[in-house]
Amino acid sequence: ENLSFNPLNEPCGFTTEQYARVFGETLIAIREADPVRFVMLDGNHVASEPVPLFFNFKSTGQAFRGYTPHAVSHYRADYIHDQPKGEPSWPCGPGPEDDPNCWIWEQPETTLKKYAWVIGTGYPVMIGEFGCRNKLRHETCLKWMEHCLKLWRDNGLSWAIWNMDGPCGFLDSDRADVDYEDFHGHKLDRKMLNLLQKYMQP
């Protein structure tokens, strides 16, 4: 009875009208089967823009992403072709302000500002995904993660990490610069786990 779900991950290329039609029809069908089931909707444009139309729908919320800036969270990801010239650091990045490859001016706060007014309405909002790929230096990754986690905690936001095990997680992440701890046959990144636990909300 506590199970919720997200009907569509990171809708992209939708006009507001298309988003409203697709999710509106989906919610109607869900409500016919279960009038009170909570449904989390990703914001439009890869979960970066809130859609106010659904604020009046009972038992719904909206999720956005916690990957800003992508040059940090997705550093050297094999599916990202536009990479920064140098390896990112945190909180400073390579390049001057007018350098298009410089990501320092894109902060996690930038994404949060788009949803700040929604949070103020009391409508449920959360960070549906966040994490940092395993090619970034571990120290930099943890600094960036703590920046994000503190920001969200201070704004009363819940969050979900992209994966617990794998390239963004704290188990079997295959990072070259982590002193892993054996945990029931898995390689545990204790520093990352401790950081996440530090900011977990009851």
Task: Provide a role label for each language-model segment.
Residues 1-102, 112-133, 154-155:
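Active-site region of glycoside hydrolase catalytic domains
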Residues 15, 19, 100-107, 137, ...:
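Residue-level preference for long, well-ordered alpha-helices that form the structural scaffold
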Residues 39, 108, 195-197:
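Generic hydrophobic, helix-prone segments enriched in Leu/Val/Ile
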Residues 107-115, 145-149:
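Short, acidic/polar
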Residues 137-202:
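Aromatic-rich peripheral "rim/lid" segments of glycoside hydrolase catalytic domains that contact
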